[in-house]
Amino acid sequence: MKALKITGLSLIISATLAAQTNAAEPIYPDQLRLFSLGEDVCGTDYRPINREEAQSVRNNIVAMMGQWQISGLANNWVILGPGYNGEIKPGKASTTWCYPTRPATAEIPVLPAFNIPDGDAVDVQWRMVHDSANFIKPVSYLAHYLGYAWVGGDHSQFVGDDMDVIQEGDDWVLRGNDGGKCDGYRCNEKSSIRVSNFAYTLDPGSFSHGDVTQSERTLVHTVVGWATNISDTPQSGYDVTLNYTTMSNWSKTNTYGLSEKVSTKNKFKWPLVGETEVSIEIAANQSWASQNGGAVTTALSQSVRPVVPARSRVPVKIELYKANISYPYEFKADMSYDLTFNGFLRWGGNAWHTHPEDRPTLSHTFAIGPFKDKASSIRYQWDKRYLPGEMKWWDWNWAIQQNGLATMQDSLARVLRPVRASITGDFRAESQFAGNIEIGTPVPLGSDSKVRRTRSVDGANTGLKLDIPLDAQELAELGFENVTLSVTPARN
């Protein structure tokens, strides 16, 4: 009996774990199909949906059924048409609601960016809103697919053709040309598409530069002194270190005024180019044009480990240099903007969630770019189209059923295609640095030795002394601050 109890308990645990690993999957109404192959029978690569799945999208299913229609679900359940208020109950039917065994992911593809050449803000916007293939046609077709009437001009029978593009303040308005004759109900009331609230965000990873003009390092000063060993034993286990801070000056120019409207999302470090290392940071949420130059202070050091024979000295030479670098640069700025559709909806079918039939005038704004809110986010609404509670704006399932999944995916991908503007200019920097500390040939100490003692540094109890002429004011004028020399025991 004990063995049987353990086996039964194991089965219960296994069943529980199996149930826990299979979470409910969303049912996208646009992928449902009604098959008339008999009770619980679906076409190839389809399966009957069960009661719980049908319950999650009941309103969508009922909207696709006849008034008194009864269709089957899995496991001897049926769903009734709108005449029965969409009741789900046990029963049998000759038709069956089915769902793909491998549902399409149906994600909106991400297309390569639409790149706009450099220019000021008006130039960049003009190029975008006047581009028929990459902008006018895609946004016009989206308005048409959603049910807006008359998205086109009098001189063409096609959506998105013969469109006027008008600048209104900081906005641009697209509307079908009404300068000709038209036939159809309220055909003189063209739907409009307003483009507004342009913003530009720098993409740090898009940095590129042209030919680099880099000067050869120029010697600006030489410091010569001595390392003296006054002891009776050779000295070789000590490091002589030069520490200093140097100020590098940099500047950038921006070719066009668009840079004033470009902002940085995160703290941005200017990429290092060439041998002149200038570490530049631009704070987050700043205008790209707000910081066009400055000075960067950097702490640097150079070390050498001299070998100084007993009662000898070696010459020490430190060379100080400066170098310049300049080059043209380019970044990309990601553009974002609002699209506002305005016009009356077609009575013969529209994708507004209530599907009104009285041709109401409707204005709706989509945000193209970063997420703002659910009402303006195409991707959010598309991804949540299986949730009845989130279908407060557009019925994307209806749009898919009317126009096809591939058509809607392509349309939305073109509307959401990233748009990037070029930011160009010139960069220049000048920096100072010390070369290697050079050690010369040892010279025995003698009575005729004369050592300039502008600055003397002793190694603690080492018998090693540095006599280096360091003029703080002179070095500061050359861009070298806080210059110190030290003698410390070698670490390795």
Swiss-Prot record:
The keyword Disulfide bond applies. The record marks 374, 390 as: Important for heptamerization. The keyword Membrane applies. InterPro entries: Aerolysin-like_C, Aerolysin/haemolysin_CS, Aerolysn, APT_dom, APT_N_sf, CTDL_fold. Its main location: secreted. Residues 446-492 form a propeptide. Residues 1-21 form the signal peptide. Residues 256-288 are annotated as: Part of the transmembrane beta-barrel after proteolytic activation of the toxin and insertion into the host membrane. GO terms for cellular component: extracellular region; host cell plasma membrane; membrane. SUPFAM superfamilies: Aerolisin/ETX pore-forming domain, C-type lectin-like. Disulfide bonds join 42-98, 182-187. PROSITE patterns: AEROLYSIN. Secreted, cytolytic toxin that forms pores in host membranes after proteolytic removal of a C-terminal propeptide, leading to destruction of the membrane permeability barrier and cell death. The pores are formed by transmembrane beta-strands and are approximately 3 nm in diameter. The C-terminal propeptide is required for normal protein folding and secretion; it maintains the aerolysin precursor in its soluble form and prevents premature heptamerization and pore formation. This is Aerolysin.
